UniProtKB/Swiss-Prot annotation:
Gene Ontology MF terms: zinc ion binding
Ranges annotated as biased composition (Basic and acidic residues): 61-74
Keyword terms, alphabetized: Apoptosis, Cytoplasm, Cytoskeleton, Metal-binding, Microtubule, Phosphoprotein, Tumor suppressor, Zinc, Zinc-finger
Positions of region (Disordered): 1-105
Function statement: Potential tumor suppressor. Seems to be involved in lymphocyte adhesion by linking RAP1A activation upon T-cell receptor or chemokine stimulation to integrin activation. Stimulates lymphocyte polarization and the patch-like distribution of ITGAL/LFA-1, resulting in an enhanced adhesion to ICAM1. Together with RAP1A may participate in regulation of microtubule growth. The association with activated RAP1A is required for directional movement of endothelial cells during wound healing. May be involved in regulation of Ras apoptotic function.
Organism, as annotated: Rattus norvegicus
This protein's name: Ras association domain-containing protein 5
GO BP field: apoptotic process; lymphocyte proliferation; negative regulation of lymphocyte proliferation; positive regulation of protein ubiquitination; regulation of protein localization to nucleus; signal transduction
Renumbered zinc finger spans (Phorbol-ester/DAG-type): 117-165
Modified residue annotations for Phosphothreonine: T347
Taxonomy of the source species: Eukaryota, Metazoa, Chordata, Craniata, Vertebrata
TM ranges: none
Chain ranges of the SARAH domain: 361-408
Amino acid sequence: MASPAIGQRPYPLLLDPEPPRYLQSLGGTEPPPPARPRRCIPTALISASGASEGRGSRRNARGDPEPTPRDCRHARPVRPGLQQRLRRRPGSHRPRDVRSIFEQPQDPRVLAERGEGHRFAELALRGGPGWCDLCGREVLRQALRCANCKFTCHPECRSLIQLDCRQKEGPALDRQSPESTLTPTFNKNVCKAVEETQHPPTIQEIKQKIDSYNSREKHCLGMKLSEDGTYTGFIKVHLKLRRPVTVPAGIRPQSIYDAIKEVNPAATTDKRTSFYLPLDAIKQLHISSSTTVSEVIQGLLKKFMVVDNPQKFALFKRIHKDGQVLFQKLSIADCPLYLRLLAGPDTDVLSFVLKENETGDVEWDAFSIPELQNFLTILEKEEQDKIHQLQKKYNKFRQKLEEALRESQGKPG
């Protein structure tokens, strides 16, 4: 057998038999070829004439039995708990993304507060001006203070309070922070001024103290000395705030971009809300040797996004001596990291506490001459009232002593 030429097929290909083709004659009209039925179309929809043509006719010619129609593919059942998703056609209408500008309903798990449980009484601010816990403005003369939670406000702000009293049943319901279990408690608290007279150390002395401090530090929070003589380190501040703090409401948390660019998210809204911080919460700060108490307070308020005036708070140092806890209020110009370096890393020896500035320094330059004269008049009146009370008290003692002497003279022995 001769081999086929190059480019020709060596053997005939075995293909499926093609359906018969109908050629239109010149004399008459021939019916068009029938359409091939789809797989999923039921048998009842196929016309009899179409079924007898094409493959059906060839099957009948061979004598093969009629195959049973294959059922259409059924859709998958939807799993419980899931909604069936509908697929949009390409180019179909996309529904508009409508977002509400109105306030969403509050979480039902958050209990609504109505300012209940407070026991307000008049408070005379003799040591200096105070601060309103509701509006944040300064209180100069008369204020109202709750006997339980120490909530302080203007008399005109009393009807606007919505925060419930935290200590309705007394001071035993203080919410302790989880960190408070790590700190030993003492029975006696004595507020006493501790005077320290020390000369400023040299760079060599500071280096020796830092080496000694880092050798005793067990939590990898040592201090680092720079070439210019300054040093950096960590301090822990205990927050013992009994009065509520004011924070902005409805803002997003501070992002890394805001922290780098020093963007304050609280400045983007005028809405305010108040809440109680847990007692004895601990906050750690990384500061330098030149950081003052005023900057530490401002840094703490910025971390918690508190919008209250920094003069409302004060930083105290707490030392343990002879079984007693001694508190000393630090000046706004003191450097806490230097005190931490002198005391060592042990928090039982020295710790820092942030409290309300109840006995703040009075800025007399902020008052006018008539106001200062009014203060003098009030002080003189209070002084005279105190003198009259003491005179009346000792006059009663004198009368009782004289009566006792007269009764004893008539009795023998």
